[in-house]
Amino acid sequence: LLPPVYRAETLLAPVENSDKSTGPLLSFGVLEGFSGLGTSGGGDAAEALATLTSRVFTDAFIKEEGLMPVLFAERWDAATRTWKADAEMPTAWDAYDVFNRRVRFVSKDIKTGLITLAIEWRDPEAASRWANRLVQRINAERRAAAIREAETNIAYLKEQLAETSIVEMQQAIYQLIEAKIKTIMVAKSLDEYAFKVIDPAAPPQDPVRPRRAAIVVLGVLFGLLASAVVVLVRHASARRRRR
């Protein structure tokens, strides 16, 4: 029989933190040759969603949570805490492939824009824990990215400020530096920087597969088949005895 698989889901709302403060500098050409100055680095919903399912992010999550022995339990010797000698040691790519295709599922509601992150696993407690930890990690990573980018932007703007004597440009740069400082302050104050949790994952009570109804139906069919086989065998035995 197939082992039961449980599905834990968390409902998320993307948080938009895009920085629109570059407008005053466009007319002065300050942004020329400097990519990414106008973005927050962590608040773009599409980028955050892409990061959530990316290989780099997933590899880091698997390593941080120590999931390699869990994902490949049949190859892991729990007693010696080493990979079995007669089994091929899985690679990071193997782990990403399994996690991305069989464990983690992400869907977006076109009408509402809400995102459902689901984890399917044999242990309901682990499924809910991984789902919630993924959200915590993506929020922390996007928040850190926003802070790093804003700090880089500020350093660049200070260089530009030292190279210009145009009063209007200086004022515009000061405004943008102020906006970048605000971006850092906002990022540091928000735990849910990229995704707001509407409904956190909880350990599911019933497996998503195999379903109980299907098990019952298969059990009935198997019982009928077994009964038919018994009847046929007895009938054949009775015919042989009569001969």
Which residues fall in each region the model found?
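Short, glycine-rich, amphipathic interfacial segments at transmembrane boundaries or analogous
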Residues: 2-48, 75-90, 201
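Juxtamembrane interface at the cytosolic side of transmembrane helices
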Residues: 4, 226-243
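Flexible glycine-/small-residue-rich
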Residues: 12-16, 108-110, 119-121, 199-201
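Short, solvent-exposed secondary-structure boundary/capping segments
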Residues: 21, 116-119, 206-209
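Solvent-exposed, amphipathic alpha-helical "stalk/arm" or coiled-coil-like segments used as scaffolds
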Residues: 46-60
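Soluble oligomerization/assembly scaffold segments of membrane-associated complexes
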Residues: 56-194
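Interfacial amphipathic helix/helix-coil modules
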Residues: 180-222, 235-238
